[in-house]
A protein has these predicted regions:
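A cross-kingdom feature that marks ATP-driven nucleic-acid transaction machinery
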Residues: 8, 19, 335-496
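Phosphate-binding site recognition
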Residues: 1-365
Length: 496
């Protein structure tokens, strides 16, 4: 039976020496943050009575390697980190690990002749009682790039040998488009062979907060607005330093990992990084529709659409639709808005890219004081809306909302927009919310404005939520106490 895992909660291991991490010397005392559901999924595969072929994939930096290393830490296993090298070099490296794991073939050969004999020999790896032959191949797409026949070869070996043995073979990769097209699609030789599929997502805000455990809830939310749920980014911040100090020292300073991160990833993922940089800067500056993006980047709409599709494939961009959009309407793509999904990319293209020249000469304090600090809360407004929507999803799972929500998201039309909306199946029951990431309390006019907006949504039952960074006015608190349809949620409550 195919086991597809769609994680609701996620996090990753917590290592401040991440950049120098050595897979062969895993520290068992290292703190590991979250990923509870993902680990349980992998453990269920491991303890299954049947052979397992598991595909783990997700964007770069999301924590795949750390999850798999943590999962395998107390088990006999082979963890092969595929190098970007020639086929022969890759095969030699894999042979070495197989022989070190006890393959009897080591007595007769110094290296496997080909991938067929190497993969087939997994069956002969010795195991202890109660364990299974666990082989993890990280960055599997690197191997396929050197030998395109590998998926067909594994398919044949799986069908005729591996699927009847005590094997758990894990194929892991960061090239999401490649994994989905070349391994999981119907055209792939491996289609239908995977017994488990784990698409790893960025961690939710409540797990990301564990990277800065001593921060106030407001600073945890601000950190998430800057770095998002990508563990490699979060681990760069020093939890004993303030948010502004971390921004200056860990993002704005030349030579740091985050300073050059977007440039590195764009060159890793795309052949034309300059074009993609231009598109992302246009979206970050407010261009959210295809024609607007095409005009700002001086691209033909058809060409711009292709670039945008590629950015969506690597989870840097998304096309967002109103929460009540019908499937047919969404497929026609008439009202969709392009948004940068990665919080750090949004921060980088909004603040770093336009100021690179001055940062290159070391004007860190000036750029922060005049270009970033005055606009930081404005930039955090959209990520804060996502935090509030995720809080609603979690509360929905906890059954604490007035009704069971079927859809949760943002809503807009040509005249107005609502930050977060939850609807039931019939869309007759609504929960609408306003999210304010600002330094003054929310007062009654904000509520009245929200109530007026709901007139565009024809529902028979309406509930109102107000999310505040800095609390609520006394008058609004009194009103909410007397009206059960109004709920006030502070930033502190978001982190409870």
């Amino acid at each position: 039976m195919l086991n597809i895992f769609h994680p609701a909660d996620s996090a990753t291991f917590y290592n401040r020496d991440y950049l120098n991490y050595d897979l062969t010397n895993y520290d068992l005392n290292m703190t590991f943050i979250g990923r509870t559901d993902e680990l349980e999924f992998l453990e269920s595969c491991y303890t299954s009575s049947k052979a397992q072929l598991v595909v783990v994939y997700g964007r770069r930096r999301v924590g795949k390697t750390e999850l798999l290393t943590h999962f395998a830490r107390n088990k006999s296993h082979i963890f092969f980190a595929s190098p970007s090298a020639s086929k022969n070099e890759q095969l030699a490296a894999f042979s070495k690990q197989m022989f070190e794991a006890g393959s009897p073939a080591a007595k007769y050969i110094s290296q496997y002749a080909d991938w067929e004999s190497a993969i087939k020999d997994i069956i002969n790896i010795p195991t202890k009682e109660g364990e299974r032959k666990l082989v993890i191949i990280d960055e599997f797409p690197y191997l396929v790039k050197s030998d395109s026949s590998l998926p067909s070869l594994i398919q044949n070996l799986w069908d005729h040998a591996l699927k009847d043995d005590n094997v758990m073979l894990v194929l892991c990769g960061s090239a999401m488009g490649f994994i989905e097209k070349e391994i999981l699609s119907e055209k792939s030789p491996l289609y239908g062979r995977a017994t488990g599929i784990l698409k790893m997502l960025p961690m939710p805000y409540w797990d990301a907060a564990e990277f800065v455990p001593h921060y106030s809830p407001a600073d945890k939310a601000l950190t998430y607005a800057i770095l998002g749920g990508i563990p490699h980014y979060l681990v760069q911040f020093d939890p004993d330093e303030s948010v502004d100090t971390n921004i200056k020292r860990r993002i704005l300073r030349r030579g740091t990992a985050l300073y050059s991160e977007t440039e590195f990833l764009m060159h890793q993922e795309f052949r034309e990084p300059a074009t993609y940089n231009t598109i992302l800067q246009a979206v970050a500056s407010g261009a959210t529709q295809l024609n607007d993006i095409a005009q700002r980047t001086m691209l033909r709409p058809q060409a711009a659409s292709t670039y945008l599709k590629n950015l969506i494939e690597v989870n840097i961009l998304e096309r967002e639709f109103p929460v009540n959009a019908k499937t047919v309407e969404a497929s026609k793509a008439m009202r969709g808005l392009y948004q940068i999904t990665d919080n750090f990319f949004r921060f980088w293209y909004a603040f770093i890219a336009p100021n690179l020249s001055n940062l290159e000469i070391g004007d860190i304090d000036g750029i922060y004081q005049y270009e970033i600090e005055p606009l930081l809360h404005d930039l955090a407004a959209t990520p804060f809306e996502h935090i509030c929507a995720d809080w609603l999803r979690r509360e929905n799972m906890r059954h604490t909302l007035p009704f069971r929500a079927q859809h949760i998201g943002r809503w807009w039309n040509r005249k107005t927009e609502i930050d977060v909306v939850a609807t039931d199946k019939t869309q007759h029951r609504l929960l609408v919310g306003e999210c304010k990431f600002r330094n003054k309390p929310i007062d009654i006019p904000i509520l009245r404005d929200l109530q007026e907006k709901t007139a565009y949504l024809g529902a028979t039952e309406k509930h109102y939520l107000l999310f505040a960074l800095n609390g609520f006015s006394t008058e609004l608190e009194r009103l909410a106490q007397d009206d059960p349809s109004i709920r006030l949620v502070s930033v502190e409550q978001l982190y409870q």
